[in-house]
Each structure stands twice: as C-alpha cells, then as structure tokens.
Regions:
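Short intrinsically disordered terminal tails
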Residues: 1-3, 127-131
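Charge-rich, low-complexity N-terminal segments
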Residues: 1-35
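Intrinsically disordered, low-complexity regions enriched in Ser/Pro/Gly/Gln/His and often acidic
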Residues: 10-12, 46, 110, 116
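Active-site scaffold of zinc-dependent metalloenzymes
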Residues: 29-75, 90-91
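Post-HEXXH active-site segment of zinc metalloproteases
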Residues: 67-68, 73-78, 87-128
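Walker B catalytic acidic pair
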Residues: 83
Length: 131
C-alpha cells in the first residue's frame, strides 16, 4: 500500500464530497475509482505532464461520490485557481445545473461561493492548515 493522505470536505448543500489528495497516483487508484465503477488507470493519474488533476470519483471503501482534487503541493495559486474551476464545473454537472451568465441578476452567486469554498479547502491543505 502506497503512502498518501486524503482530506475530506463536505459542502453540505451539495450531494458530493470534495477529496483533496496528497500522495502518488498509485495512492489515488487504491482509494478511488471513476464515477460509475470503472477503475482509474495509470494514465488517468499520471502526474508527469500536469501539476493537478480533478475527477468525479467513487470512494472504494463506501462508494460515496465526490470530486477528487489531486495536486502537487508546489502548485502556484494561479494554477490552483485554474483547477478549482474544473472542480466547480464537476460539482455543477453533478447537480445537473448550468453555470449562469454574469448578467443573470445574481444567479451566478452560487457558483462564486462554491469556487471560493473549493479554493479555500485547497489552500488550507496546501498551507498545511488542515489536520
């Protein structure tokens, strides 16, 4: 069994968890599979060419659904924000919603709050402020 750590966050209002994973791709594959039951492949979690990875997954231990956010702790803030957007779109697609336009009379606020929450979770893990 490979070494790693899973940080779990529950957005409460949304029916999916956010798992931020530190460790190897092998560690991710030991604990998660793709949503729908398909196993993650080595290519899915290959970090040689990317600094972060986001995927809709199931936790193998209990089949809970969520978003896995796997990143190198050396990730810069601008890259982290980029990946947070991918996590946001994964959450939004899981509730069968669309991202609203800016000119939608404030209807985009839910997405702004959700991406803020995702970034805050990631930033706390990156800064070592989560136990």
């Amino acid at each position: 069994m490979s070494k790693g750590r899973i940080y779990e966050f529950d957005p409460i209002l949304y029916p999916r968890l956010l798992w931020i994973v530190k460790g190897s791709g092998e560690f991710v594959r030991e604990h998660f599979r793709k949503k729908g039951g398909e196993e993650l492949t080595e290519d899915d979690v290959d970090m040689r060419y990317v600094d972060a990875w986001v995927c809709k997954c199931e936790r193998k231990s209990d089949n809970r659904l969520g978003i896995v956010f796997f990143f190198d702790t050396g990730l810069e803030a601008k890259q982290l924000v980029h990946e947070c957007y991918h996590a946001l779109t994964a959450f939004v697609s899981e509730i069968n919603a669309d991202l609203p336009d800016y000119d939608s009379d404030g209807m985009e606020e839910f997405a702004a709050y959700l991406i803020e929450w995702i970034f805050d979770c990631c930033w706390k893990v990156k800064q070592g402020k989560v136990k």
